[in-house]
Amino acid sequence: MLLGSSAGGHLAGSLATRFTEDVYSPVDAADRQSARPDLAALLYPVISMQADITHPGSRAALIGAAAGPSLVDRYSVDRRITDDTPPMFLVAAGDDNIVPVENSILAYRAMLAHGRSVSMHLFETGGHGFGPNLPAASPASRWPDLLLAFAAAHRLLG
């Protein structure tokens, strides 16, 4: 299982959608093993590089603020989802003022369009960067248990 949040969610989503790409010449047998994760858990992730949806700082750092359409497509996780993308678990909060929740929705829709297993949990509140640190009374505090249940449903837990 692979987990990433915010910009780390983009990294995790990229690995989940680009694991077949050759990024270096193999040195030994380990380099020939699949890099496909069994499950990708993305928390309030940066998914899209589209200027009106992305986190501007992430886009500027990764592809540049003035990047053209081909770079936007290449680095937008939702546009890289295929029929081979592993199951995906998404968590976001509607009041996230850092990474628009539309990012998670785009990933969810793309997973459905490719018939992939996906579980999205969109909470009313939680903001950005909450991780496992929310008060127990907050509905978003349940995401770790929801992730474990999703992983168990995919037989990834003992």
Question: Locations of the language-model features?
Answer:
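C-terminal catalytic histidine-bearing segment of alpha/beta-hydrolase fold enzymes
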Residues: V91, V101-G158
